[in-house]
Amino acid sequence: MSAQSGLSLYDSKRQQKLAFKPLVEGEVSLYVCGPTVQSAPHAGHLRSALVYDLMSKWFSALGYRVKLVRNITDIDDKILENAKAQSIDWQQLAREMSDEFKAGYDKLAIETPSAEPLATDHIASMQKLISLLIDKGHAYRANDGSANVYFATLSWPAYGELTNQKPEDMDSSDELLAGKVAANDFALWKASKPEEPETAAWDSPWGKGRPGWHIECSAMSTDLLGEHFDIHGGGLDLRFPHHENELAQSRAAGFEYANFWVHNGLVNSNGTKMSKSLGNFVSADNLFEQDPRGLAIRYYLLTAHYRANLEYHDGVLAEAKTNIRGIESFVKRALSLIAPALESPSAFLQNEFDFDLLPADFVAAMNDDLNVPAALAVLHEAIRAGNSAVDAAEINSVTEQLGATIMMCKALNVYPFDVNASGEAVWPTAEASAELKSKIEQLVADRLAAKAAKDFARADAIRDELTNLGVTLEDSADKTNWSVN
């Protein structure tokens, strides 16, 4: 059985794990609801992007050609509200926040998707889709004479199929707008308001306004992937009402739409969903202050199954750094032992990804609905066995376990090593290295100043912080040398 044929994914709509078979042999089409760029990213945003980046990478490792589309919602009530509160142009806010999201993705080695459409670039497609729904009797202009247009949920008997709800039992969380026929009807087109900027309104057959949130994703996904594609992904909090409404309007328009619906769990703080509205979130900037390298953040975000919620507390990155150091330690020990038998130790570290070197248990875990925690267990078992082999100087076993470890780390993109021209281990990216070096040098200088001022408690605290960054200090009479473990 090929590795491809062994892959299964959990479909949220059918509520079961199913064998994955793409619509087009050898190709995978994947649409993911990206961020609404109203403010800077937090841990939950990073996790969602990481999940689908890893999913895309695993499909590629299996030999598929992947088209990943992750949208950016750059027009929204909250964007307008936040821009007004900050006295800046809403388009400027959207651009600046989009840049912050991209910076966070880059630091976590999350690749740029095949396409990253802006909602505002697809207004014409949204209007065309709304007109189609009106023509089919599934949408109507508001009965109060405004430019609002609503999806008629009563016209679509399957409404509620994604979340297995009956319309009468739904807690409609769509905003209460005038002119609706039924409580669950949701906005496809929203009339502009006098207090909103003119640039946030577009001409339409129904009057000036802007698209509703749900219609945006239906238009962008079908524009870029067609009316029938393999997978639709997004956060668990988007299942209702966003994805429920998105599915209803797409199917009512006559589209087959997504074969699989995949939802990632949330990042919680003290058992509660991390969100900006609750003020209980940890920002991406805060995470990168704790881990400029970004590798421990990535490792931490992978420690729970993607469908499960992930708990955040102050010690999670320290735990992740310990695991990363365990990988580093084994690779260094193993390479030191086998280096004499290698033509080029640095070339060994730089070997291209080789799927055939992945242990069968690792492949089975990843093919089982992307079970990364089980895959990490296989990785750490290989490290344990490899360390034992190093202790026993079993060259062949060490070489085998080292090769497997490197390939597993590369598959998960938690590989802690690159090499310089001398074959010495260095940080994965020059950008991360420069940022980390700057932070370390500042902390070392602060510690020297604290010692000079006889503030030894402060000096010890800085030493602890440097230790958590994987830094070893060597004090001399007039200076401090440092190295990274």
Where are these regions (language model features)?
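Alpha-helical recognition segments enriched in aromatics with Gly/Pro capping
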Residues: 1-38, 53, 124-337
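N-terminal, positively charged nucleic-acid-binding surface of large information/translation enzymes
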Residues: 14-19, 23-111, 129, 482
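Short, well-structured beta-strand/strand-turn elements
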Residues: 65-67, 137-144, 472-474
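Short catalytic-loop micro-motif centered on adjacent basic/acidic residues
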Residues: 68-69, 113-117, 232-234, 399
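Short, glycine/charge-rich beta-strand/loop segments that flank catalytic centers
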Residues: 72-77, 97-101, 111-126, 143-155
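The substrate-binding groove and active-site-proximal loops of carbohydrate-active enzymes
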Residues: 83-90, 114-120, 207, 235-236
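Structural preference for alpha-helix termini/caps and helix-kink/transition segments
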Residues: 281-485
